[in-house]
């Protein structure tokens, strides 16, 4: 089974990448705590799924204390997305959404 962890900067394209991965046949889950990844993979294997991915978002970091331990045990492919600050700023200005890491100076938060 292929197991992928998709993460990166807020506004860097995780939602778009998730859609592409789903189009490639990945079963994707958002912000599932790492301690639940092994049961997810067991269930996926039992159902014959060949590709599973999880999206890790900065807003869910409180649930990710055991991330390093689980990454070592499962050895997933990790995809980290980033973009230039001016691109992130433009995307947030287009969507008019509040940056998930703070409502202060947007450029500083990026």
Curated annotation (Swiss-Prot):
Pfam families listed in its UniProt record: RapZ-like_N (PF03668)
Domain of life: Bacteria
InterPro entries, sorted: P-loop_NTPase, RapZ-like, RapZ-like_N
This protein's UniProt keywords: ATP-binding, GTP-binding, Nucleotide-binding
Binding residues for GTP: 57-60
Gene Ontology terms for molecular function: ATP binding; GTP binding
Annotated ATP binding sites: 8-15
Biological role stated in the UniProt entry: Displays ATPase and GTPase activities.
Family: Belongs to the RapZ-like family.
Protein name: Nucleotide-binding protein in fmt 3'region
């Amino acid at each position: 089974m292929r197991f992928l962890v998709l993460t990166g900067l807020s506004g860097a394209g995780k939602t778009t990448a998730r859609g592409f991965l789903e189009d490639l046949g990945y079963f994707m889950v958002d912000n599932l705590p790492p301690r639940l990844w092994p049961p997810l993979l067991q269930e996926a294997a039992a159902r014959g799924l060949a590709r599973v991915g999880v999206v890790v978002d900065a807003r869910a970091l409180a649930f990710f204390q055991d991330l390093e331990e689980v990454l070592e045990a499962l050895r997933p492919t990790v995809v980290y997305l980033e973009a230039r600050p001016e691109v992130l700023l433009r995307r947030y200005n287009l969507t008019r959404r509040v940056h998930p890491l703070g409502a202060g100076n947007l450029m500083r938060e990026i």
